[in-house]
Swiss-Prot record:
The gene is cnsA. GO terms for biological process: geranyl diphosphate metabolic process. It is an enzyme of class 4 (lyase). Belongs to the terpene synthase family. A motif (DDXXD motif) lies at residues 81-85. Substrate binds at residues 174, 227, 314-315. Its cofactor is Mg(2+). Mg(2+) 1 binds at residue 81. The Asp-Asp-Xaa-Xaa-Asp (DDXXD) and Asn-Xaa-Xaa-Xaa-Ser-Xaa-Xaa-Xaa-Glu (NSE) motifs are important for the catalytic activity, presumably through binding to Mg(2+). Mg(2+) 2 binds at residue 81. PANTHER family: BETA-PINACENE SYNTHASE-RELATED, TERPENE SYNTHASE. This is 1,8-cineole synthase. A motif (NXXXSXXXE motif) lies at residues 220-228.
Length: 330
């Protein structure tokens, strides 16, 4: 763990896919082919983030096209998220116009010709992600992608109004409209383990999904705090706590840490209840295996997110003042 990083007790083993180096080469080639990275200097900057390592940690058993998909979706997310760090992200109308074009790529009839490279890349990803999945999963994933994408409009409005959300509103926004719901769907896709419909909506599985979602979101908030603060972005739980409670930085960090510990503990207490749940519902053994595999994917994501956020150069502070430009690959 690099010096200066907040540390958390994440009681899951740290793992990384042994094919991550080759996966990164394929991933960077895809980013260049999609027009998301242009030129050798941009590629060198991007590689310093260890971009494929996050997918390799989340999907430590994946191979081939499955691993590539996982890495490519993360890479697209970095580029899409950073796109709104510029002028578009402070203009709700521009943001809405851009986001609506991205959402349109989820339509089976969508033609990406002439679209922005981010939307062309998203169309490619959605075709690859959705193809082997059930219609039920696809409908759920469309809803989650749409919620995530349209949340950028809310964030742009907040930036324009210089609005800081309440703690409760922020946690709800992160839970419903952050990148995590699409990533939880991605776990099912890459691990080839679709959660059986009868158990997906149960309190036990929803608790596991919720605690995974919030754990990863807020660990990310803590470890990216300096970068986001330097950029003037108020959408970070530590900053929200400080603003609402008029607390010190250390007090806000301590509150965030307690939340993360509680979510981790809840996950650990809930997981052992799954076999009995499946027994009560009469879930076939093959479907139980899919559920257990998806939950292992959640555990790998919780740990992998923490490890990668702590090791990547993406969250280094590139803007010592509020006027300088960040060193990014875009």
């Amino acid at each position: 763990m690099p010096a200066g990083h907040e540390e958390f007790d994440i009681p899951f083993p740290s793992r990384v896919n042994p094919f991550h180096a080759r996966a990164e080469d394929r991933h960077v080639a895809w980013m260049r082919a999609m027009g998301l990275i242009t030129g050798d200097a941009a590629e060198a900057t991007y590689r310093r983030w260890s971009p494929a390592k996050v997918g390799a940690r989340w999907f430590y058993l994946a191979q081939g096209e499955d691993l590539d998909l996982g890495c490519d979706i993360f890479g697209w997310f970095f580029a899409y998220d950073d796109h709104f760090d510029g002028p578009t992200g402070t203009d709700p109308r521009q943001t809405a116009a851009f986001v609506n074009r991205t959402v349109a790529m989820l339509d089976p009839r969508a033609d990406p010709t002439g679209e922005h490279p981010l939307n062309i890349a998203f169309h490619d990803l959605w075709q690859r992600e959705s193809a082997p999945m059930s219609p039920l999963w696809q409908r759920r994933a469309v809803d989650h992608w749409t919620q995530y994408l349209t949340a950028h409009i809310t964030e742009a409005t907040n930036r324009t109004r210089h609005t800081s959300p309440t703690i409760a509103d922020y946690l709800e926004l992160r839970h419903r409209t952050g990148f995590m719901p699409p990533l939880l769907d991605l776990i099912e896709r890459v691990w080839r383990a679709e959660i059986p419909a009868p158990v997906y909506t149960t309190p036990e599985v929803q608790t596991l999904l919720h605690t995974t979602n919030q754990n990863i979101n807020i660990v990310n908030d803590v470890l990216s705090l300096e970068k986001e603060e330097a950029h003037g972005d108020p959408h970070n739980l530590v900053l929200v706590i400080q603003h609402e409670r008029q607390s010190t930085r250390q007090q806000a960090l301590a509150t965030a840490r307690r939340m993360i510990d509680e979510w981790t503990d809840t996950f650990i207490r809930t997981e052992p209840r799954l076999p009995a749940l499946c027994g009560r519902l009469g879930i076939p053994l093959a479907d139980r295996t899919s559920l257990y595999t998806a939950v292992e994917g959640m555990r790998a994501a919780i740990r992998g997110n923490y490890d990668w956020c702590a090791e990547t150069n993406r969250y280094a502070v590139h803007r010592p003042t509020g006027t300088g430009r960040a060193t990014t690959p875009w």
